[in-house]
Curated annotation (Swiss-Prot):
This is Transcriptional repressor NrdR. The keyword Transferase does not apply. GO terms for molecular function: ATP binding; DNA binding; zinc ion binding. Negatively regulates transcription of bacterial ribonucleotide reductase nrd genes and operons by binding to NrdR-boxes. GO terms for biological process: negative regulation of DNA-templated transcription. PROSITE patterns: ATP_CONE. Pfam families: ATP-cone, Zn_ribbon_NrdR. The gene is nrdR. Belongs to the NrdR family. Residues 49-139 form the ATP-cone domain. A zinc finger (unnamed) spans 3-34. Keywords: ATP-binding, DNA-binding, Metal-binding, Nucleotide-binding, Repressor, Transcription, Transcription regulation, Zinc, Zinc-finger.
Amino acid sequence: MRCVQCGHLEDKVIDSRMSKDGTTIRRRRVCLRCDYRYTTYEQIERTELRVVKRDNLREALNREKILRGLVKACEKRPVSMDRLDRAVEEIISELHRDHLREVPSSEIGKKVIEKLYAIDPVAYIRYVSVYRQFSNVEEFIQEITQMRHQTLIDPLQRKLPIL
């Protein structure tokens, strides 16, 4: 690694730590010529995923586009930007795990919906209403009723013994 201070190519790693999520390694280095200390980060370089749109056009997966959708859904809700950033990273990791080169845009929408359901119910309803193109109040009521039913069932399912 080239020293950022003097340009020398030889250094020594004095400390390495893995990030909490296990995707990045932080390394403290010292230049063997000038003793300047600096930090580097090492990550796996993933192949770029392409998004297949409804009209079969393809474009690069855009992290910012996913984040904008989450931010819009969570507008004026008690959800931190850190939580939304984590959700985007989780979505992208899941997409890379499940798809090699291309991912349908509908799959991204489903992942966003899953994350929002766990983060904030109002944000979930906002996003789903646009994603599924709700056209009347009945569709909102139906979705909310389904959410309530799911909320009642989930705690019961967790207590059932596995046979």
